[in-house]
A protein has these predicted regions:
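N-terminal switch/interaction subdomains of large nucleotide-dependent motors and GTPases
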Residues: 203-226
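N-terminal-proximal low-complexity accessory segments that begin disordered
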Residues: 4-37, 43
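Generic surface-pattern signal
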Residues: 18-22, 40-47, 107, 111, ...
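Conserved small/polar residues in nucleotide/adenosyl-binding loops
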Residues: 227-232
């Protein structure tokens, strides 16, 4: 059941589901009951190991795949419209070429899996400084860590309303194939796509992807807009 009627969010969820074909879609409402249910599922599947409750209450262990233990600079791209816009220290690929590549990787990537829709806020929800995002993922690890690192759930969607001012993100573990691992940013579209990784720095999109890379573009864009307004 959708938790919002926001057109941008619904379009992201629909298009991602059509491409990745998950068995079900779960919207993250931010409740402790839902998060605890996901922890139990992750323990049952072996994705999480619950630690000694007396010594480390409420703590879990997650082990990364041996080939997926760090950020990958060579697989991180800024797909702006022009190479110059990406900057001299970043990897660049034509946006259309990269999208075609990612679509093939994501095709049926979530078959048999659950797709989670995470509404999150960078900053206090409702603050004029808050920035909102949506991350669609097939990883419980991502859901649980985004709940720790950001503010998540229905309150974010309520604050967002029908606004299109939102960062849209897609993530899938796919097969964790390092040869097809990509962390990609489309700054003009406010969009992030990461595939074939389940490592924090690559897949917790509010962290490096949004608050470092996309936010630097937003800062420049908003500063230019503000300067333009003052000039007139």
């Amino acid at each position: 059941m959708e938790l919002t009627q926001n057109p941008s969010v619904l379009e992201l969820v629909q298009k991602t589901a059509e491409l990745t074909t998950p068995k079900e879609i779960v919207w993250i409402d931010g409740s402790e009951a839902q998060l605890e249910s996901l922890r139990k599922i992750a323990v049952e599947t072996g994705e999480l190991i619950k630690l000694n409750e007396e010594k480390l209450p409420g703590c879990y262990l997650n082990r990364s795949d041996v080939n997926d233990v760090a950020r990958v600079e060579g697989r991180t791209f800024i797909c702006s419209r022009t190479r110059e816009e990406a900057g001299p220290t970043n990897n660049w690929m034509d946006p259309d070429e990269m999208k075609a590549k990612l679509h093939e990787i994501l095709r049926c990537a979530m078959a048999g899996r659950t797709m989670y829709v995470i509404p999150y806020s960078m900053g206090v929800i409702g603050s004029p400084f808050a920035k909102y995002g949506i991350e669609v993922t097939d990883s419980i690890y991502v859901v649980l860590n985004m709940a720790i690192m950001t503010r998540i759930g229905t309150k974010v969607l309520d604050a967002l309303g029908d606004s299109s001012d939102v960062i849209l993100g897609v993530h899938s573990k796919v097969t964790l194939d390092p040869e097809n691992r990509y962390i990609v940013h489309f700054p003009e579209e406010n969009k992030i796509i990461s595939v074939n990784s389940n490592y924090g720095g690559n897949v917790l999109q509010g962290k490096k992807c949004f608050s470092l890379r996309i936010a630097s573009v937003l800062g420049r864009r908003e500063a230019v807009s503000y300067t333009h307004l003052r000039a007139h």
